[in-house]
Structures are given as C-alpha cells and as structure tokens.
Amino acid sequence: MNYRFTTLLASTAGAIAALAATAAFADDTTTPAATPAAAPAAAPAAPSPAPYPAMSASLAANAPPLTFDLGILGSKVTIGGVLSGYGQAQSNPVFNGSTGKTDQKSTIDLSNAQLFINKSDGVIQYFVQVGAYSLPNLSDLPYTGSSKAPAADFGNLPQGFLKIVPNSVFSFEIGALPTLVGDEYTFTFENLNVERGLLWGVEPAVSRGVQGNATFGPLAISVAWTDGFYSNKYNTISGLATWTINATNTLAFDFQTPTDKQNVITSITSPVLNNETIYNLMYTTTVGQFLINPYLQYTSVSGNTVVGYGKEESWGAALLVNYAFDAKSALAGVSIPFRVEYMSTQGTEVNAPNVLYGPGSNAWSFTVTPTYQFKQYFIRAEASYVTASKVITPDGYGFSGDKNSQVRGIIETGVLF
C-alpha cells in the first residue's frame, strides 16, 4: 500500500468515523418530554435520504442525512457515507496473474470507506463520491482488495458529476456517471447482495460523459454519450426508459452500443466489452413484503479483425427477490434477498471472445443474503454458488482454470450514515 493511498484511506476513514459518530449521537440523543399540547399535530412526512448513491431495498441510507451550509457550495449540502468490512471464504480459488499464485481461500478486507456529498436543490446541483472500495462479483477473476481496487478500477473519486436542473421536466449531467445499464449497482452496499452477479459482469458500471434526462408523467427517459466501459474513448450511446405503471409496478428498458469499433485495452476492460452492444428488459413489482425483480439481457460483440476475434452473443435471465419482515414484527430490520441467474454464450472456441467461462459456455448462479439493519448499522451474511458447463480451460475456476463450480461464504458489516 503506497503512502498516497494510506494517507487518503486514513483521512477518509477518520472523517467517516467522525461523521458516523455524529449521526449515531444525533440518532440516540433524547430530549426532555414536552408539555402535552391541546391537540396532536399532524404527523410530519417521513424523512428522505440523499438521492445519491442509489440503493436497493435491503439496506437504507441514513434519513434525514446530515446537512451543512457550505456557503457558495450550497446551503443545504448533505454529507453521508459508508464504512464496512468484508470477510470471504471460497472453494476452487482461481489463479492470480499479478501474484503468480492461487487466489486466497479466505480474505478479510475493507469493502467500503466512502463519503457522499450531495447538493440536490436549485438549478445547479452536484454529487461527489470519494474513498476506498472493493468490487466482489461472481466471476473467474481473482479478488482485488480495497487497497488496489481504486487504482485498478475507477479511482478514489469513482463517481462525481454536475447536474443542471432548469425545470421539473429536464435535467442534464456531466462527469463520472453511474451507468444507465443493468439492474444492479456498482458498490456492495447499494445492492440486495454483496457480490454482483454474472449478468453484471458484462455491463458497464461507471462511464464518463454527458447525460440528459426527461420526465413525462409516468415515463422517465435518459440518454447518455460516454466512454462506455470507462475506455476514455467517447464513442458510446446508452439509454434508459422507465415506465411507472402504478405505485407497485415499473417496467424499464435500457441499451448501450458503441458507434464505431475500438481497440482500447485498460485495467478495467478490453476491446471485447468496449465493442459490445447490450440490451436489458427489467420489471419490478412489490407484493406485500416481497419485492420481485426479473430481468432479461442480450449482448452482442461484433468481430474485430484488428484484435483478432470473431462474433459472440450472450443471453441472460435473472430473478432478484427481497423479503422484508414487517416493521412491527419481532424481526423488524431483517430482510432476505436472493438472486437466481442463468447466462448462455454463443460462440466457437476457435476465435470467439470470452465473456463468461470460455466461448460457448453457460452458467447458473444462486445467491442468498440474509440482512439485518438497525438504524445506521448493518450486518449481512451471504452464500453463493456458481456452476458452469462447457468451460474452456483456463477460463474456469481453480488454479488451472479447469473447474466448473465455486461456492463462497461472505460476511459484510458496517455503518451507513
């Protein structure tokens, strides 16, 4: 761990600890009982968390968030964050090319030490996310710890953008943007499960560029021009349309495609993903205590003679479900999310690119993540299982990449504020 990272991590963690303590104190401090009023006042509206980063249903950000008057930077700037630790054990660890050894069977790490700064009022708004993180996901790639993940992925300022909101219909964003594509977010705390799934592995996570948004009644539309898979080549268009059918049902469609071929290779991605076209169809419904979210995915990678590979297609389907126990029950704060996925690739071993466990491979996954949150504090356990067929060595699991399955057990615990 180099000095710059150590300094940043120490300062970020210190700031997070101080803010978390402030939030916890504010949450736990009681005041003397007031003199009863002649008549009860109407109940105030429930406080809302900051708009960014986005969160799934199993964890909730602190509400209301800590708000500060920062003068020229805004009089209602909210500052929040997450500090969390992560422990993992796995079967069939894969070969780690950076160390020349097999990936560790067990790992203890810092999964998040991040601060979030939001200004979400007025015409000029902004969001800044800063800190350290790791990005565990279901794949045949070795785990990259939080001391190295920012340098290998999106830096210590992974997301940050300026947002112009001229009216209630239109808005515009520029900067490092969360992707419009897919049904899972980038960071562990944002999702139902700690690890992102198989389908997430072929989706962009953060893209740099510009984005326009419009809302027309129940229909919300966003279109972006970006560098796609963080390639630093601005040749990719993406879009998202979301139809809010009613209070409990939404239907969404997204896509991303490059406008021309590219041969960019970075630590984050490759020409395979940089030249990928992807579509997702997603439906979300709430039934009682259940949130049910199925989605379908299709990807296509066109041949690239410069890099030397042919065409590859993939089809995927996933079902994400969360059951949250009633807030009035003895198990208030407990939820049980799970995810089931299937992904199939169409390609030949000769020259097709690899987007799974070798050209022509397919895989199933099952992940369950019992979760408990009390105020800002949370803990969740996770068990995941992946089994693949038509695995091409060395793209599978194990030291030689010839194994077709992996089991993982994970604990993540921390504080959101």
Model regions: which residues?
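N-terminal periplasmic/intermembrane-space "pro-region" immediately following the signal or transit peptide
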Residues: 1-95, 417
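Outer-membrane beta-barrel pore domains
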Residues: 3-5, 29, 37, 41-44, ...
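Small-residue packing motifs within transmembrane alpha-helices
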Residues: 6-14, 214, 243, 323
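Enrichment for repetitive, rod-forming helical segments
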Residues: 11, 125-126, 136, 203, ...
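Outer membrane beta-barrel
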Residues: 63-96, 100-238, 242-251, 326, ...
